[in-house]
């Protein structure tokens, strides 16, 4: 966004746990590379991009004063988190005086309260918060947890009102496969860079970030103008359903059909003359018919999913997907089967075949 819009911002990284990688990041002058690998409109891509927007990285367990001083910066506006599914949780043992609180929501509440006091409740100094943890309606969960800390720590009605009216905590859905550090490719990457980057992050080309927030927020966070696949929508739920139905659902039925046909890699299954036709039929003729989103959006998403399945850099074994296939089918495919039957008056043969293969 800095390169393609007038966003003109920097990032401070705060690690959520005691032991993290901020020392390594600071040792590299807060620079690292992202290695994107995959297919983009049928073309193979293997790119390296330097990330240079981080101004510094903090460990709140050893630099708590510096962490809290972030709240004193008037231009601070966005908080974006990814602390894993376990990160958004209420820990009643946390205290306001802890330096810092052990839980992420506790740390965030401390930061918000310090900002509230620093600016005497000025509503123009509220923060926009985007949690990216893989929890359905993660923003709702984080907001509820902050309210629990406001109650536990008796922070008062004035702060609670400021948080409600000046701050926004928005649910998001993120979708991108990020294998992380490219151990098998790092020697070639360092040779290409001509220096050591020990924090290279490998990821697929595809990316999606759905944010349940009003369009006014999109104006402040102009990701769409930067050409990024970031959607500001009234409700995250249809996009969550789309991902489960058109990404996870096909995986669940494709894998046993491929395995019984002697094919062991997802990419090879998609390129198989028979299995490839099968999964296309399941996605475009069956599962897509059960969703209530614009058809062009669904078609584009399904095409992107197939490109991801065909990623030449990822050998995704079908046996790893087949673990717990029955409960996976129940949550990912059975709802679509029922909806298809209700709407069409007949069973979707591809989904039935997948169930039989399981």
Q: What label would you give each PLM region?
A:
Residues 2-358:
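Substrate/ligand-engaging "lid" and interaction regions
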